[in-house]
Amino acid sequence: GVIRGERTDGAMLAHAVDASESSQPRQGVRGLVIATFAFVTVFAASAVPIPLYSEYKGAIGLTDADISATMLMYLFGVVLTLFLSGSLSDAAGRRPLAAASLLLAMLGCFLFLRAADPTIVLVARAVQGVSCGLAMSAVSALVVDSAVGRYEGFGLAVAGCGALLGVMAGSLAVGFLSLVTQQHALI
C-alpha cells in the first residue's frame, strides 16, 4: 500500500491505503461488467434449445436418441475446446477468444433457429459446446483478470457461478417466451 499522512489535532496519522482498492479505475469496472455479461450470456445461449427440444420433436422429427446425441455433441465440444483453449488463451489473448466465444454462441442460436433436420441440431449443439468451452477457459479468466481490488471477490464468484446463472436465466427466459407465445397463439 501507499502511506499517506494526515494532520489531525497536531498529530500525524499514517495509514496504509491500497491504491487498487481506494478507487477502481472506470475502465477496469467497465471491463469487468462486459466480461461478466459475456460469460453469463454464452451460457444463457447454451440453455436456449433445452426447453425447445419437445418443439423440435414435432417440427423436425427430433428423436429421444437425437436429444441424447445433442448432449454428447455439446460435451465433446466443451472437452475438446478446454484441452486446446488454455494455451490458446495465453498465446492469442483472452479478449479475442471471448469475442470468438460470443460469436460462436450467436452462431449456435442461429443454427437452432434455422434447424430443418436433426443433423443441424447436432451441429448447433457442438458449436455451443465449443463456445462454452472457450467461455469456461478464456472468458472466466478475463472476468478474474478484470476483477482487481475490491471487486476480486465478485470476479471469483462470477467465474465460479456465472455459468449456472446463465444456464438458469436462458432456460427460464426461453421457457417463459415459449409459454407466452403459445398462449398468445391460442387467443
PLM feature spans:
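Pair of pore-lining "gating" transmembrane helices in MFS-fold secondary transporters
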Residues: 28-52
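Helix-breaking motifs and short loop linkers at transmembrane-helix boundaries and internal kinks
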Residues: 61, 93, 114-119
